[in-house]
């Protein structure tokens, strides 16, 4: 790290702490990766950024150096103590669960309008433990109108699944839901040695730039149920998978397949985003 901010090991020693394995704590200390994440999350000075799981504050410090206005979320009281001690009132610190945030309220308080007539939004950034990735992503997707972009450090295999192309082996529920709302890309691979303590797997930086959905659906909540059902029984055909989920009467399902131009003998992972959206509209 730089002279301005101590290394992860130095901070843990200073505060007599250890990384908590049960919390998935692996602290990123590689300068180049921190700089890339901060640049992606806060391209302009003054940008409001919500950092999920701020930890020891290494990314927080980089965001501040870029002139970002940082709202740091940290549930671990030990980490919150470090953040207060090292960064003080330069940040707004919230001791809260990152998967249970009210993004509308946070955006209204700290966010910036995306364009004339649009509501306030925040960029969201964080180094997400594996076990919290899905809950946090679903929380963001439920409140996507209040998020401008998301930049996450994830396990490499998770990041690659989220950015997977349609009809590929890694194409799944979260791939469909996230890519409907955002342009998604894997920006760089991060080796275990960039962290302390080093994890056993590679990580990757994922960037999601939120924009109006490219494919309209009849009912967003039903769309999620539809896609979940289609991927829930991957070995079954769409006719059987959606029929088992009882999303509609069999005759209505058959009519929807015909109207959407989707062969009910296909499997869910073979459908593109546009085909999923067309099937949802046909069910409406």
Curated annotation (Swiss-Prot):
The keyword Coiled coil does not apply. Its main location: cytoplasm. Its EC number is 2.1.1.182. It catalyses: adenosine(1518)/adenosine(1519) in 16S rRNA + 4 S-adenosyl-L-methionine = N(6)-dimethyladenosine(1518)/N(6)-dimethyladenosine(1519) in 16S rRNA + 4 S-adenosyl-L-homocysteine + 4 H(+). Pfam families: RrnaAD. It is found in: Cytoplasm. S-adenosyl-L-methionine binds at residues 26, 28, 53, 74, 97, 127. It is an enzyme of class 2 (transferase). Keywords: Cytoplasm, Methyltransferase, RNA-binding, rRNA processing, S-adenosyl-L-methionine, Transferase. The keyword Ribonucleoprotein does not apply. CDD domains: AdoMet_MTases (cd02440). It comes from the Bacteria. GO terms for cellular component: cytosol. Belongs to the class I-like SAM-binding methyltransferase superfamily. rRNA adenine N(6)-methyltransferase family. RsmA subfamily. Specifically dimethylates two adjacent adenosines (A1518 and A1519) in the loop of a conserved hairpin near the 3'-end of 16S rRNA in the 30S particle. May play a critical role in biogenesis of 30S subunits. This is Ribosomal RNA small subunit methyltransferase A. It comes from Anaeromyxobacter dehalogenans (strain 2CP-C). The gene is rsmA.
């Amino acid at each position: 790290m730089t002279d301005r901010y101590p290394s992860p090991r130095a901070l843990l020693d200073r505060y007599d702490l250890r990384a908590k394995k049960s919390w998935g704590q692996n602290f990123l200390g590689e300068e180049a990766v921190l700089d890339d994440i901060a640049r992606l999350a806060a391209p302009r000075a003054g940008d409001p950024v919500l950092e999920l799981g701020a930890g020891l504050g290494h990314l927080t410090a980089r965001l501040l150096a870029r002139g970002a206005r940082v709202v740091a979320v940290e549930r671990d009281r030990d980490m919150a103590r470090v953040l207060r001690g090292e960064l003080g009132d330069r940040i707004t610190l919230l001791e809260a669960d990152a998967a249970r945030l009210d993004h509308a309220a946070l955006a209204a308080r700290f966010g910036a309008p995306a364009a004339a007539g649009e509501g306030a939004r925040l960029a969201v950034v964080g180094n997400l433990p594996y076990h919290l990735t899905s809950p946090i992503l679903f929380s963001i997707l439920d409140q996507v109108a209040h998020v401008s972009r998301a930049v996450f450090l994830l396990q490499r295999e998770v990041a690659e699944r989220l950015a997977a192309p349609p009809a590929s082996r890694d194409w799944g529920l979260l791939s469909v839901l996230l890519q409907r709302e955002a342009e998604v890309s894997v920006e760089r691979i991060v080796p275990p040695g960039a962290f302390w303590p080093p994890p056993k797997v590679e990580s990757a930086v994922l960037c999601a730039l939120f924009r109006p959905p490219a494919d309209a659906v009849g009912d967003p909540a039903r769309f999620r149920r539809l896609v979940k059902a289609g991927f829930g029984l991957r070995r079954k055909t769409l006719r059987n998978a959606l029929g088992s989920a009882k999303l509609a009467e069999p005759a209505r399902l058959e009519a929807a397949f015909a109207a959407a131009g989707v062969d009910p003998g296909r499997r869910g992972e073979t459908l593109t985003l546009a085909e999923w959206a067309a099937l949802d509209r046909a069910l409406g």
